[in-house]
């Protein structure tokens, strides 16, 4: 039911995690959101940054976030030349995020750094002339804002070959199967999928087809 309402939005794992988390909250937290980072991160789909956002924006407590927008602001402001996707860089950014939290109105700071990253300190063509942080931004003052963040070279994406079986009856209905396995489109419906042609052939032999010889490879 959740996925049917979620249809078309993408990120279907988020829909499943919402339902899982709701059940945990009802069972273990009296249907209330916990107010500790540890308990929040125990919920499916919630990591350290999301937990920090919930604590800061929802409970107005002092907690750091480090989403993509906040990362970009911090690496440019402090001119961190190491690749942003390194574990060591992430650890450094978490320390910086914690050290620079204000003692009061942390919720306003959290919303502000996300907005600056999303609207001003953008991935390309940052609007430094509009940025309230540009005066002390090391990257801007050294004219390196377009060179940072540094990223590791992208790995070549693997090519995966699969076979889909498309079966249609006289009424125009097609055969679909639920994808229970982990991976792409988990829990959704698709044509029967096979990694090898032999698997497809074996599968079709078990089906009560009126004309099995009509199956063609395309």
For every predicted segment, state its role.
Residues 1-127, 133-142, 209-212:
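Catalytic cores of DNA base-excision repair glycosylases
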Residues 118-218:
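Intrinsically disordered, low-complexity, charged terminal extensions of DNA damage-control enzymes
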């Amino acid at each position: 039911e959740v996925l049917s309402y979620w249809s078309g939005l993408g990120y279907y794992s988020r829909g499943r995690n919402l339902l899982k988390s709701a059940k945990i909250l009802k069972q273990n937290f009296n249907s209330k959101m916990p107010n500790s980072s540890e308990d929040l991160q125990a919920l499916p789909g919630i990591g350290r940054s999301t937990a920090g956002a919930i604590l800061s924006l929802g409970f107005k407590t002092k907690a750091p976030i480090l989403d993509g927008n906040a990362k970009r602001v911090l690496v440019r402001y402090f001119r961190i030349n190491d690749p942003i996707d390194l574990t060591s860089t992430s650890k450094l950014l978490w320390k910086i995020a914690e050290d620079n939290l204000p003692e009061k109105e942390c919720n306003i700071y959290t919303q502000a750094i996300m907005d600056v990253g999303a609207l001003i300190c953008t991935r390309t063509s940052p609007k430094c002339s509009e940025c309230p942080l540009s005066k002390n931004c090391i990257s801007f003052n050294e004219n390196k804002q377009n060179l940072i963040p540094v990223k590791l070279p992208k790995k070549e994406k693997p090519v995966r070959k699969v076979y889909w079986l498309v079966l249609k009856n006289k009424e125009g209905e097609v055969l679909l199967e639920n994808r229970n396995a982990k991976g792409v489109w988990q829990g959704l419906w698709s044509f029967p999928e096979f990694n090898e042609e032999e698997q497809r052939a074996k599968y079709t032999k078990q089906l009560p087809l009126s004309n099995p010889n009509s199956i063609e490879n395309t």
